[in-house]
Every structure is written in structure tokens, then in C-alpha cells.
């Protein structure tokens, strides 16, 4: 490629609405331009990187035995009504009517469509296993699209769907996809972690997320630096922090705590560690034809409720936060001084694992300006229902017993799910088993955010000059910057020869023949993030030298003209082989 025949749309300034580095640099590097909120044009520079991501994804999906197809972006409402997600999905599902007033959606995902394919095309267990995948444009009507391609409304995604005759088959399909994802993100040159995760709105029984590690990541990841353990904070198991409950050492006592409604303030007033206080979270669940059930969830004062874990407790699937009126009616006092002692009405108490092992702790007295100290299980309170209902914290013991937890931020770029029969049962996608009986197929689904990968890669690879692409997804691997290409025959001949040699070796190279000043050329290609740069000039040629600089290098080095091509070829191939 020659730059004079290519579109390079670099900008000196980022748009005012760009909040994070990747959004700013993708616009400035001429990769994207905004069309509407969360919707972008992908300019030639950006599209080249997208195609490289797609190529790696396709190679690894094919290697894992998946079969590519293409499903429609527009889907009939009937399929979503069959699965039950027409009502459940919410406003992120873009719905519209055609001229016949029939309901349709723009697909945010394709479980329903692919299940429809399977139920119509797969009749026998002998046709299984099968794994279909596509690379398709999706649309989710985000309430607040932001961060460029990181949280857009329209985006490109690879989604795959496996069908098996039984759970053993599903587990094997899942393993193959998990391994394929590890290979994909390794080849993309990203620092990533695979973490145990919650299934969310997709449903199913087991899942892992793949996160690119970056300070700007929206997700908190709990991991153990001395083992392989990693999980989304929402899913990470929180072990009890007290091995055994100590015997009571204090008498229970009602204590004045005027104006101290927060655990931190109570601990400071009483001159005790925050870890001895109890935080009371009040939830409510509806009962048809009866009053709501009120729940009191007890956490240590320095811990936070994990709502996903709480929602999985029996009876709490559809909980909501209790209203102030419900709290006053049940406890006799407004929030701030609540606890399990002397409630006006019965409540269901659930204690976090750590709280269940505490002794001589402090709870609200259900009276404004008062707390009760020296409270103990068994003596002052009945033994509680015990569950893991909190988020893990840095320094907690790792669930695998091999160290302690640390927390980092991550950007989710992939997710694999074991769906089971959630969709096949709802949509009657069955096949005949070995006995001739119809059986719902076991499904898995596996997604990768193709366009999101670009933003995540930039968040992990940039400096004050611009993007620093991994070779595997750089729009170009090498840029040739001739000084005076249009004025010096020697420079032009050397540049053209080097260009031809690199092309013949299969290197993705661009020759900047625009006639720009050196400062403009260098600034453009550093902003765009091309990994390798060779500068050809009359002065260097007289000495038989070219100037080489890797995008991560602090300084340039001189290479003999006759060695320059092979040196760069070796560097590119070594990087791609990692």
C-alpha cells in the first residue's frame, strides 16, 4: 500500500465528548467517526485492524471445529416470544414494526435464531455435536452509549452456538471454545485473564469471561497473584475471615450513638475497629395476595453486599430494596440504626459467612441514636441462615487456598456460557437420542466483541504519542518513511526496492510517498501506532544505513541497507509467532 493512494484521516485534537484514551486515539488516528450516539463509521485504518481481528478469530474457530454461517440482523418477534425474552430483555432490545405491522427486532444476540435453525435441521443425535458461528453486526440500544466502541450501540461480534446430545458433550464443546479463546487473545497480543463469571440475562449454568487488563476497565476482577484463580468480583467466592467463632467476652449493652448512623462513625465513636460493626441491608420480596416479606442481610461493616449472590438465595430471586415506610413499619425506626434485635415484625435474617463467625459485635438497636454492643450468636440472637452474600476484597484469602486476593480492572472482550436446555426446551429444539426418544439439545454460546477488542487493546497499549499496536492487529506492520521521495532518485529507488522486498515476504507495509515533512510523517504513524518504522534518507544512504525504530523503542538505531529488510521481517515474524 502506498500512502498517496490510501485515506489517512488523522486529527491533532480529540472530540470534546471523548472520555477515555481509546476513544480519543481512535478518532485522532482516523479509525472511526461518529454517526450518532454509539454508532460509528469505520474508516480504512480502523477497518484494516477489524479485519485482522476477524481473521484470527475465524482461524481459531475453524481450528476448533466450528462452522461459519450468517444469520439475519433483523429477527421476527415470534422467536423472542417463544424463548420468553421478548418481555424480559428490556429497552436495550430495539423493536420495530414493518409495513404489515408485524413486530421485529434488531438482534443484540442470536440464541433464538440459531435454535430455530437447529430444531428444523437437526433430527438425530448422529448429527451432533455441531457448533455454528458468525461474525455479525449487532445492536443494543444502550441507555447511555459512551467510551467510543467500548460501549456502543452498534458493534461487530463473533457469536458461536454449540449443540450436543448430553451434558458431557456440552462440557467438551465448552472446553474447546475456552481453549480457542485463550489462543485468540494470546495471538492478539493482549494481557488478559479468563475469569469465572455470572451468566446474567443469557442464562445457563456456567460461564467464563475474558478480560483485557486495563485501568479503565468497567469490571473489577478478583485474582490470586500466586495461583491461577481469577473471577469477576460478582462471582468470586468470599470465604469467612474468622476460622472459628470466639467465645463471648462482653455483655450485651445498649449504647448511645447520637447522630452516628454509619458503621464508620459508630466505630470511631466507640473506639473499636470497623470490623466489629454490622451493616444491615433491608430487602423485600413480594407475595401474591399478602404483605411483602422483609429480609435483613447482615454484613461486616467494611463489606459490601453482592446483589447477584443475594438474588440466588432461596426466596430472594426477585428482591427489591425495602422502602423507608416498610422499614419503619417492621423495625420501628428509619434506616441508620437497624438490627436484628427487638424488631416490631418478624424478619428473615441472613448472615454473611464472616458475620456468622463473629462474636461481641455491634448492631443497630432499632432506636434512633442507639446501637447495641457485645452481641453474640446463640446467647443474644438465634443462629442465622448463613450464606456468601458479599463482594470479595483485596487481602481476602483466595478460594483455592493458594494465596490472597488482589483486585484489578478489566474490559470484557469475550464470554463463554453453558446454556444447557434453557432455549432448546423453550423452543422445542429436540433430536432423537440412541433410544429413539426426543431429547432437548444441550447448548453453549460463545461471544467475542470484535470492535470492542480494538478499544481494549488501545487502553492497554498507548503512550503520549499515540497507539502502540500489537503486530497481529496493527493496520500496517511496517511503515517506510522516505525523506524527499519526490525529490531524490536515490531515496525513491531505495524505498521502492525495500517496499517490494517486504511485500514479497508477506509483510503488511505502507510506503509514505505523500511528500510530507518528516515531523508530520512521524507524528501520523506514531499516532496510528504502526509497530515498525524505517526511515530512508540521502544522508544515511551515503553511509549505507537506514534508520529503524520500533514503536516501543525510545530511540532509533541504524541498520545496514542490505540487512534492513531481513531484520524487519524477522522482527515482525517473531512478534506474530508469540
Curated annotation (Swiss-Prot):
Which InterPro entries does the annotation name? aa-tRNA-synt_IIb (IPR002314), aa-tRNA-synth_II (IPR006195), aa-tRNA-synth_II/BPL/LPL (IPR045864), Anticodon-bd (IPR004154), Anticodon-bd_dom_sf (IPR036621), Pro-tRNA-ligase_IIa (IPR002316), Pro-tRNA-synth_IIa_bac-type (IPR004500), Pro-tRNA-Synthase_IIa_type1 (IPR023717)
Annotated GO molecular function terms are: aminoacyl-tRNA deacylase activity; ATP binding; proline-tRNA ligase activity
Any Pfam family the entry gives: tRNA_edit
UniProt keyword Nucleotidyltransferase present: no
Kindly report the protein's main subcellular placement as a broad class.
Answer: cytoplasm
What is one GO cellular-component annotation here?
A: cytosol
PROSITE patterns, per the entry = AA_TRNA_LIGASE_II
Q: Which reaction is catalysed here?
A: tRNA(Pro) + L-proline + ATP = L-prolyl-tRNA(Pro) + AMP + diphosphate
Give the record's keywords alphabetically.
Aminoacyl-tRNA synthetase, ATP-binding, Cytoplasm, Ligase, Nucleotide-binding, Protein biosynthesis
- Write out the GO biological process terms: prolyl-tRNA aminoacylation
Q: Please state what class of enzyme this protein is.
A: ligase
Its subcellular locations are: Cytoplasm
Q: What is its EC number?
A: 6.1.1.15
Q: Which family does it belong to?
A: Belongs to the class-II aminoacyl-tRNA synthetase family. ProS type 1 subfamily.
Assembly information from the UniProt record = Homodimer.
Query: Which function does this protein serve?
Result: Catalyzes the attachment of proline to tRNA(Pro) in a two-step reaction: proline is first activated by ATP to form Pro-AMP and then transferred to the acceptor end of tRNA(Pro). As ProRS can inadvertently accommodate and process non-cognate amino acids such as alanine and cysteine, to avoid such errors it has two additional distinct editing activities against alanine. One activity is designated as 'pretransfer' editing and involves the tRNA(Pro)-independent hydrolysis of activated Ala-AMP.
Entry text on domains:
Consists of three domains: the N-terminal catalytic domain, the editing domain and the C-terminal anticodon-binding domain.
Return the protein name: Proline--tRNA ligase
Amino acid at each position: 500500500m502506498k500512502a498517496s493512494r490510501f485515506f489517512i484521516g488523522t486529527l491533532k485534537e480529540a472530540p470534546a465528548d471523548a472520555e477515555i484514551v481509546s476513544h480519543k486515539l481512535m478518532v485522532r488516528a482516523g479509525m472511526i467517526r461518529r454517526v450518532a450516539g454509539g454508532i460509528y463509521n469505520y474508516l480504512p485504518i480502523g477497518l484494516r485492524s477489524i479485519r485482522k481481528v476477524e481473521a484470527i478469530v475465524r482461524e481459531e474457530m475453524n481450528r476448533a471445529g466450528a462452522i461459519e454461517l450468517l444469520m439475519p440482523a433483523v429477527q421476527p418477534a415470534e422467536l423472542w416470544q417463544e424463548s420468553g425474552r421478548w418481555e424480559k430483555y428490556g429497552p436495550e432490545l430495539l423493536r420495530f414494526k414493518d409495513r404489515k405491522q408485524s413486530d421485529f427486532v434488531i438482534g443484540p444476540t442470536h440464541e433464538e435464531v440459531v435454535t430455530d435453525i437447529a430444531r428444523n435441521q437437526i433430527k438425530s443425535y448422529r448429527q451432533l455435536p455441531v457448533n455454528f458461528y458468525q461474525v455479525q453486526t449487532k445492536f443494543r440500544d444502550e441507555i447511555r452509549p459512551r467510551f467510543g466502541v467500548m460501549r456502543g450501540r452498534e458493534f461487530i461480534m463473533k457469536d458461536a452456538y454449540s449443540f450436543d446430545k448430553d451434558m458431557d458433550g456440552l462440557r467438551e464443546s465448552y472446553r474447546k471454545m475456552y481453549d480457542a479463546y485463550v489462543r485468540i487473545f494470546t495471538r492478539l497480543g493482549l494481557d488478559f485473564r479468563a475469569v469465572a463469571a455470572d451468566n446474567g440475562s443469557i442464562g445457563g449454568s456456567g460461564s467464563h469471561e475474558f478480560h483485557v487488563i486495563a485501568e479503565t476497565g468497567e469490571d473489577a476482577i478478583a485474582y490470586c497473584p500466586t495461583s491461577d484463580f481469577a473471577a469477576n468480583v460478582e462471582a468470586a467466592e468470599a470465604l469467612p475471615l474468622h476460622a472459628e467463632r470466639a467465645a463471648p467476652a462482653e455483655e450485651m449493652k445498649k449504647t448511645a450513638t447520637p447522630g452516628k448512623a454509619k458503621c464508620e462513625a459508630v466505630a470511631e465513636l466507640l473506639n473499636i475497629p470497623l470490623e466489629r460493626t454490622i451493616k444491615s441491608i433491608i430487602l423485600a420480596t413480594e407475595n401474591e395476595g399478602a404483605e411483602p416479606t422483609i429480609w435483613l442481610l447482615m454484613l461486616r461493616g467494611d463489606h459490601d453486599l453482592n446483589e447477584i449472590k443475594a438474588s440466588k438465595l432461596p426466596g430472594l430471586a426477585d428482591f427489591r430494596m425495602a422502602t423507608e415506610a416498610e422499614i419503619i413499619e417492621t423495625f420501628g425506626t428509619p434506616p441508620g440504626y437497624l438490627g436484628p434485635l427487638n424488631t416490631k415484625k418478624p424478619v428473615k435474617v441472613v448472615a454473611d459467612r464472616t458475620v456468622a463467625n463473629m462474636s461481641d459485635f455491634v448492631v443497630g438497636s432499632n432506636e434512633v441514636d442507639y446501637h447495641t454492643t457485645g452481641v453474640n450468636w446463640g446467647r443474644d440472637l438465634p443462629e442465622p441462615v448463613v450464606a456468601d452474600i458479599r463482594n470479595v476484597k483485596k487481602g481476602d484469602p483466595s478460594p483455592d487456598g493458594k494465596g490472597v486476593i488482589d483486585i484489578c480492572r478489566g474490559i470484557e472482550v469475550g464470554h463463554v456460557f453453558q446454556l444447557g436446555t434453557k432455549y432448546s426446551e423453550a423452543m422445542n429444539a429436540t433430536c432423537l437420542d440412541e433410544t429413539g426418544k426426543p431429547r432437548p439439545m444441550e447448548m453453549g454460546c460463545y461471544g467475542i466483541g470484535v470492535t470492542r477488542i480494538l478499544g481494549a487493546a488501545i487502553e492497554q497499549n498507548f503512550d503520549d504519542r499515540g497507539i502502540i499496536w500489537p503486530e497481529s492487529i496493527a493496520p500496517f506492520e511496517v511503515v517506510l518513511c522516505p525523506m524527499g521521495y519526490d525529490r531524490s532518485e536515490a531515496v525513491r529507488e531505495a524505498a521502492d526496492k525495500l517496499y517490494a522486498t517486504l511485500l514479497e515476504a508477506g509483510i503488511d507495509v505502507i510506503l509514505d510517498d505523500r511528500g510530507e515533512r518528516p515531523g508530520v510523517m512521524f507524528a501520523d504513524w506514531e499516532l496510528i501506532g504502526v509497530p515498525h518504522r524505517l526511515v530512508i534518507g540521502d544522508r544515511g544512504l551515503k553511509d549505507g544505513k537506514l534508520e529503524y525504530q520500533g514503536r516501543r523503542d525510545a530511540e532509533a538505531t541504524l541498520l545496514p541497507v542490505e540487512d534492513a529488510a531481513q531484520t524487519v521481517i524477522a522482527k515482525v515474524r517473531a512478534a506474530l509467532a508469540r
